[in-house]
Amino acid sequence: MEYGFVKVASAVPTVKVADCRHNAGQMAEMIADAANQNVEIIIFPELSITGYTCGDLFAQSVLLEEAEKSLEWLVAETQSLPVISIVGIPHPHNGSLINAAVVFQSGKILGVVPKTFLPNYKEFYEKRWFASALQTPECVTSICGQRVPMQRDMLFTTGNTTFGVEICEDLWSTIPPSSFLALEGAEIVFNMSADNDCVGKHSYLRNLVKQQSARCIAGYVFSSCGFGESTTDVVFAGTSIICDNGSIIAEGERFAMDRRMTVGEIDVESIRNDRRVNTTFAESRGLHSRQAVTINALPQTPSALNLTRTVNPLPFVPSDSNLDYYCEEIFAIQTTGLAQRFAHTHAETAVIGISGGLDSTLALLVAVNTFDKLHKDRKNIIGVTMPGFGTTDRTYTNALCLMESLGVTIREISIKDSCIQHFNDIGHDINVHDVTYENSQARERTQLLMDIANQRNGMVIGTGDLSELALGWATYNGDHMSMYGVNASVPKTLVKHLVEWIANRLDDEKAKTTLLDIVDTPISPELIPADKNGNIKQKTEDIVGPYELHDFFLYNLLRHGFSPKKIFALAQIAFDGEFDNATIKKWLTTFCRRFFNQQFKRSCLPDGPKIGLSLSPRGDWRMPSDATSRLWLDECEKL
């Protein structure tokens, strides 16, 4: 698939125990269905040719012979299909019986992977029938008339990705084989399983899959036995999970009475980028001496981008189910960061410029929470509203109402006269509303805040957010500067949700109403005079673009290192019906240009707590101020 995605499938057929022909027929139909959906790799449950619950029938030669014949038929039946298939079979070898995964494609068996860890406790008795891979030396084995490699450390490469296979209990071991496979280069791990269900076990299993996927920085595709297996003592729910670097992207229905196939796309490009960034991953390779063998599959032609997985248009914003948890955690990080800075500096007051906008509102709320935690009087928070040429009644009123309801000290200082004097001093026409006109107001406000902080042994609390820093939407040495920036790692789309979350937790109805009105106010620096009706004329998103788009671009550039081409393709999916292609391209180009040419502002940022992604020059993002954006802009032009 295009853009580094690999389409995979976790298949759960309805088996008949010991009826190999039936089971092979089921799998042939599902492989054909997978091919029609452009699936590149499909996995079936453990011992799927025979069924897992054959018990002592595994010792019967008639079953083992029929299993191999059915596998041979399946390989031949699907030889015209490019799909790589992974099926389970009991495989006789050198007087032992191996619980094996067979990997095949286009009529050729690529390799046999033996199960390493055989459970032999509680309801499991696998050592009664099978030998472990630990007892089976690496070798070439005969199966279905083909001579193929058999070993536990085996990688398969397709041209689009490299993958490995482990079987059921392997995942539950202290150090799963997939850990070594990942270190050797496996980007996706496939697990064929026979996990029976007990109360509470599924939740544990899901977490196990997610954790192993995250720890290995890999995709993890899990397929477990389902309907048709014997229920003499246990029940198999037919669990299917597709996990991408710790996040479940697709999950099949459990306890279904018919066969099911779960399809999803693993973002291999993102996995590769994460492994490059995480240098600990590379260092871990030195902890083991096992060497995997690599088997080449037939190259597969990438299909067009047709994702079954969703693309989140608001990647920074927690889902509704997690909103309380994450908002509380974010707010606590901001509060604790500021509290430590006050404890260290022994500053007596916090000085904040309050505009009636989202960012200064969140900064004020953080300061209030910090002072409450430190048992300091809220009156030592000095909120300064500084009306200018573009201040509207709505933001001015909200600023005053908010400060009053929170019980902080209120100061009002108009910057109009000082700016007019400044324009006279430098010879600037007050009617020319250019960058000088705008930036002089921002710098005048910052000067006032700094001087008040000096007067009151205070600390100026920065209000700028991550999105503004990415775009350089701040006046250099104006609102760009502070003594501690509590919002520096919080993107604009998240600021809005945080303020709304805090508002809904307040008992004070006046404060709550004010906060919710601030959330609904158009984003603006208010540096240009209002329109004739007194409404905001200078709207930020009309100038630099929608913050929903910019935060989407920022997340995918910083978190995944994606190219403009891939970001554009994902944005088309995420914002389908909301923004057309021309709009997305326009603002993506703007983002790339501004992200590069505004780096000089980020190179001298004040301190501030990391929340998630960060552009701090001392931490997450070390970029030269004079780097060129040519490569990124050239790609934007070709979109």
Feature-to-residue mapping (PLM):
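Enzyme catalytic cores with a strong preference for nitrogen-chemistry domains
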Residues: 1-351, 369-378, 410
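ATP/NTP-dependent adenylation/nucleotidyl-transfer catalytic domains that generate, transfer
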Residues: 7, 23, 159, 216-218, ...
